């Protein structure tokens, strides 16, 4: 899309729309209403635009509410000569605009999609200008990642996913029940059958081989030359957590006489070093198995590589293996792959599950990946490897109990790591023991158990307004705060035994909409529940902080209130899996307070003194507080909090 003011914007033609042609006309974005911005029909099926409202014009439309194909159809019916649909969620700087399946509507004009960022640029600087779309300037997208494709690492185990890829856009699929009908189709639901078909071909060619062997053949021979965006980021390869072993190549797979895999996980194939929170440098070792299906002894060269040269140059991660491995006919040999992490060279972690929870591309700045190439004169196979290291702190306390003398006492906090250990202090108001293993789900169980560990609360000020923060810690971590855990804080403002307000976390916009976790707060039973804050939660963490304005939950700083915290399985069952109930607290009169920890945290390779004081009237105002909860950022998964039980005063 070319305009006089804005640099050319890359747009992806949607193959179910009319064929692209050279068009030029005023760029229009109808802001009359939400309906005209989105281009969706109303409940009665009425086009949001009247008659031929946009003759000779190129119409810019927002994604959302209805199928993109319906937006393009409505634009064509309104006289537009082309439709451009801007995405409504952020994407990575190298991501292509999304591709969509056909969702109905009569297609009379070409439809295109652009990114949210490019849409914002056009809206700000190019409306009313003459825009030109010229197919002669088109760039082939073959061999590049579709923006909609899911990315890894896997949700539960932080292992490499996807395993492999296949074509998934611009598919013309047979339409069931029509005999001759065809329907444009796109998505992972289109690419998965392609991989299934290639596996079936291999099973037909090698009926005696196991599922693991078939998978190894496919993954070892996939094409790794997959990019992201030939226009914006030419030559930049897609990360392992988007392509896995690469794009399937059945001809290579059927002809290979060599396979390789993670010896500890033959069905996984790839070398997944996973998420690693590290307070010091570390080394990880995996064993690779290589099988020779040939009839002669073969000596293979082994070459570990990085996907990105900048990762290798950083020195944060190094990977090594023997130069060669010899394998006799029909046999399997092994070798070690050693991956070392220099924690002092790792980037400072700034990911989260709140405001950045949907920004998968940000993982690129922290994960390290590449391939182990194994080759001889006959075969060249590869294994993907990946690690997601998190430079962590290691704050510990000198005591978990403290008896105050004269209303005061101290606890020493130490941090032997190379990173400042940030500490959030809360009034400890509730704790719960760890559930027995027998109560936890096993592989294949369709339920989750969120096991509460401790609850804390504190008064804060946000933009000059009083607010409350509840800190919750759990046994076990979650890859992302969206699922499978919801935390419900029920507040009884007047001690009548009936909960009056609720605070809870949820995904912004609904299931799988944005990836961002937010906090809702409002009156029971029906709200309205206002969303004002992102959830303060990291990835691969059992910690969460929920924030709410006091005005949204019927409190003042001096209100003594009762509250309970419920843990809910919000993915499988919707059931409450744990609860800490009946806590009483007054925000401006805690029983104990702590001070002395720098805002930057406990210094790296240093210590800080936490001073704890009793508060006059706190025992009556906040009787449930029995100490302080120390909530740690950038912590090891098994040590994200400490509780200090306090007595005396």
Where are the regions a protein language model picked out?
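Structured lumen-facing ectodomains of secretory-pathway proteins
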Residues: 1-162, 166, 174-176, 240
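Hydrolase catalytic cores
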Residues: 68-101, 165-232
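C-terminal subdomain of the subtilisin-like protease fold in secreted/lumenal serine endopeptidases
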Residues: 107-125, 164, 204-282, 293, ...
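Beta-sheet-dominated interaction scaffolds and their linkers
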Residues: 144-150, 250-294, 321-325, 352-365, ...
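Short acidic, flexible loop segments centered on an aromatic residue
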Residues: 293-314, 388-390, 488-493
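Surface-exposed extracytoplasmic segments
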Residues: 407-649
């Amino acid at each position: 899309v070319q305009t006089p003011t804005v640099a050319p914007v890359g747009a992806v033609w949607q193959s179910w729309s009319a064929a692209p042609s050279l068009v030029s006309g005023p760029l229009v974005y109808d802001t009359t209403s939400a309906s005209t911005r989105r281009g969706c029909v109303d409940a009665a099926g009425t086009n949001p635009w009247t008659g031929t409202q946009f003759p000779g014009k190129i119409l810019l439309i927002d994604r959302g509410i209805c199928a993109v194909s319906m937006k393009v159809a409505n634009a064509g019916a309104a006289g537009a000569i082309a439709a451009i649909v801007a995405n409504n969620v952020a994407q990575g700087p190298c991501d292509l605009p999304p591709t969509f399946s056909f969702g109905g509507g009569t297609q009379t004009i070409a439809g295109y999609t652009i990114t949210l960022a490019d849409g914002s640029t056009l809206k700000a600087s190019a409306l009313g200008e003459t825009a030109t779309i010229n197919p002669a300037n088109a760039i082939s997208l073959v061999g590049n990642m579709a923006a909609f494709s899911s990315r890894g690492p896997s949700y539960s185990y932080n292992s490499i996913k996807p395993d492999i890829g296949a074509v998934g856009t611009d598919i013309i699929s047979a339409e069931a029940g029509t005999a001759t009908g065809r329907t444009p189709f796109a998505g992972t639901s289109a690419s998965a059958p392609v991989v299934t078909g290639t596996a079936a071909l291999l099973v037909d060619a090698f009926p005696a081989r196991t599922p693991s062997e078939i998978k190894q053949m496919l993954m070892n021979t996939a094409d790794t030359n997959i990019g992201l965006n030939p226009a914006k980021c030419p030559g930049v390869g897609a990360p392992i957590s988007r392509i896995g072993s690469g794009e399937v190549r059945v001809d290579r797979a059927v002809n290979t006489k060599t396979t390789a895999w993670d010896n500890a996980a033959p069905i996984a194939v790839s070398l997944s070093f996973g998420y690693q929170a590290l307070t010091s440098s570390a080394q990880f070792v995996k064993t690779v198995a290589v099988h020779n299906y040939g009839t002669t002894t073969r000596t293979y060269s082994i070459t570990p590589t990085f996907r990105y040269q900048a990762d290798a140059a950083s020195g944060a991660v190094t990977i090594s293996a023997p130069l060669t491995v010899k394998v006799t006919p029909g046999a399997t040999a092994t070798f070690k792959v050693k991956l070392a992490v220099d924690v002092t060279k790792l980037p400072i972690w700034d990911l989260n599950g709140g405001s950045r929870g949907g920004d998968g591309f940000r993982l690129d700045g922290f994960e390290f990946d590449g391939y182990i190439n194994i080759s001889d004169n006959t075969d060249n196979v590869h294994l993907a490897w990946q690690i997601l290291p998190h430079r962590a702190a290691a704050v510990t306390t000198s005591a978990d109990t403290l008896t105050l003398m004269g209303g005061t006492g101290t606890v020493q906090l130490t941090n032997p790591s190379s990173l400042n250990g940030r500490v959030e202090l809360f009034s400890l108001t509730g704790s719960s023991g760890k559930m027995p293993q027998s109560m936890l789900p096993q592989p294949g169980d369709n339920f989750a158990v969120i096991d509460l560990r401790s609850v804390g609360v504190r008064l804060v000020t946000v933009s000059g307004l009083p607010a409350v923060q509840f800190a919750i810690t759990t046994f076990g971590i979650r890859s992302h705060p969206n699922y499978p855990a919801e935390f419900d804080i029920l507040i009884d403002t007047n001690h009548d035994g009936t909960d009056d307000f609720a605070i809870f976390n949820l995904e912004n916009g609904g299931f799988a909409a944005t990836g961002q976790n937010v906090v809702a707060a409002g009156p029971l039973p029906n709200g309205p529940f206002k969303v004002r804050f992102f959830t303060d939660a990291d990835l691969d963490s059992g910690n969460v902080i929920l924030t709410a304005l006091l005005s949204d939950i019927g409190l003042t700083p001096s209100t003594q209130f009762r509250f309970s915290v419920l843990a809910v399985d919000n993915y499988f069952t919707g059931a409450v899996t744990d609860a800490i109930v009946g806590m009483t607290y007054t925000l401006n009169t805690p029983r104990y307070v702590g001070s002395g920890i720098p805002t930057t945290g406990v210094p790296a390779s240093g210590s800080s003194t936490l001073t704890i004081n009793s508060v006059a009237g706190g025992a009556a105002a906040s009787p449930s507080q029995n100490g302080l909860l120390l909530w740690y950022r950038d912590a090891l998964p098994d040590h994200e909090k400490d509780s200090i039980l306090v007595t005396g005063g």
